[in-house]
Curated annotation (Swiss-Prot):
Protein name: Endopolygalacturonase AN8327
Glycosylation sites: 327, 352
Disulfide bond sites: 39-57, 217-233, 345-350, 369-378
Keywords: Cell wall biogenesis/degradation, Disulfide bond, Glycoprotein, Glycosidase, Hydrolase, Repeat, Secreted, Signal, Zymogen
Compartment(s): Secreted
Species name: Emericella nidulans (strain FGSC A4 / ATCC 38163 / CBS 112.46 / NRRL 194 / M139)
The protein's role, per its UniProt record: Involved in maceration and soft-rotting of plant tissue. Hydrolyzes the 1,4-alpha glycosidic bonds of de-esterified pectate in the smooth region of the plant cell wall.
PbH1 repeats (start-end): 147-169, 170-200, 201-222, 223-243, 252-273, 281-303, 315-338
Annotated catalysed reactions: (1,4-alpha-D-galacturonosyl)n+m + H2O = (1,4-alpha-D-galacturonosyl)n + (1,4-alpha-D-galacturonosyl)m
């Protein structure tokens, strides 16, 4: 039998239906992939795989990696406190390009070379005697950029095309027992094979480094609180500040070179301030440096660098202050046609120096020193 519902009954029925909750299917959160403790990559696909997986692994081991031509072994997106270990030989295929061949960034990163491991880009394939000044385009090797509170231990780098290690934007980086061996470039056209180029960084400590190359062993272009100690430099241009000037950051403050040897090199100690530029070189110390077989300049301090040593007008825009040079041993170290000590300063631009126990002989006295602070001397 059919019964008709009145208006009040219909209203009550509709209200009850609307008040009844609709049962939807239950949803669950997507599972979170756990970060693996250790990942190992090898072979020709290893570089790309490591780059893709760098946020997933607490420890990344690169074992006998071959990096394809024209690409960077890119570990610039590492999670905090990641460890990177190089095993065996890491090699790179050939291409003419700017690089870098290797790039590592991050916070709390530990980079290690296992016993017997080598990073060998086989730079001889690019060497033509012109370095970064011409010839074929050569890739820079290792960008250690934007590393904070990080360490690099026991890396062995062999035969870079040009500059080896660029340190930039780092704060709290410690490098121990690194070897950069470009000695093969002495007779095969290696050029501009700088060991460590440092800029815009602070609290950098390099200990026990061995650098065999054809340019600066260390060049500090800007930065604060930088120390290089217990090092061996051979074949290059010595322990350098600069050139300073003409960059975004033109301040060098509190840099120490100590207990190191420079041999078979063009220069021993060199400070280069660019002619006509502005900046500041302050609180630099060279202490306990031993010089051997220096061809051109035992100690060179210049405020007229203009692309070449002593080439420009002497200017005062980059003062050199609070400089300490002490306990320098170089008796007979300079070639007979080289210069023992050269100091060329602008007016009132070199002040508050400390100069003690400096013995650099074998070469000539430079007859055109300018504005030498009273504590120092160009004569030996």
């Amino acid at each position: 039998m059919f019964y008709a519902l009145g208006p009040l009954a219909l209203f009550a029925f509709a209200t009850e239906v609307m008040a009844t909750p609709v049962a939807y299917p239950m949803t669950t959160a997507s599972p979170t992939l756990a970060k693996r403790d250790s990942c190992t990559f090898s072979g020709s696909d290893g570089a790309a795989s490591a780059s893709r997986s760098q946020t997933d692994c607490a420890t990344i081991t690169l074992s006998d990696i071959t990096v394809p031509s024209g690409t960077t072994l890119d570990l610039s997106d590492l999670e905090d406190d990641t460890t990177v270990i190089f095993e065996g030989t890491t090699s790179w295929e050939y291409e003419e390009w700017d690089g870098p061949l290797l790039q590592i960034k991050g916070n709390g990163i530990t980079i290690k070379g296992a016993d017997g491991a080598k990073l060998n880009p086989d730079g001889s394939r690019w060497w033509d005697g012109e370095g970064s000044n011409g010839g074929v385009t050569k890739p820079k090797f290792f960008y250690a950029h934007d590393l904070t509170d990080s360490t690099i231990q026991n890396l062995y780098i062999e035969n870079t095309p040009v500059q080896a290690v660029s340190i930039n934007g780092c704060d709290g980086l410690t490098i121990t027992d690194m070897t950069i061996d470009n000695s093969a470039g002495d007779d095969a056209g290696g050029h501009n094979t700088d060991g460590f180029d440092i800029g815009e960084s602070s609290n950098v400590v390099i200990t026990g480094a061995k650098v065999y190359n054809q340019d600066d062993c260390v060049a500090v272009n800007s930065g604060t609180s930088i120390t290089f100690s217990g090092g061996t430099c051979s074949g290059g241009h010595g322990l350098s500040i600069g050139s300073v000037g003409g960059r975004d950051d033109n301040t060098v403050d509190t840099v120490t070179f100590k207990d190191s040897t420079v041999s078979n090199s063009v220069n021993g100690i060199r400070i280069k301030a660019k002619s006509g530029e502005t900046g500041e070189i302050k609180g630099v110390t060279y202490s306990g440096i031993s010089l051997e077989s220096i061809s051109d300049y035992g100690i060179l301090i210049e405020q007229n660098y203009d692309g070449g040593d002593l080439d420009g007008e002497v200017t005062s825009g980059i003062p050199i202050t609070d400089l300490t040079i002490e306990n320098i041993s170089g008796s007979g170290a300079v070639d007979s046609d080289g210069y023992n000590i050269v100091i060329v300063c602008g007016d009132d631009a070199c002040s508050n120096w400390t100069w003690s126990d400096v013995e650099v002989t074998g070469g000539e006295d430079y007859g055109s020193c300018e504005n030498v602070p009273s504590v120092a001397s160009c004569s030996t």
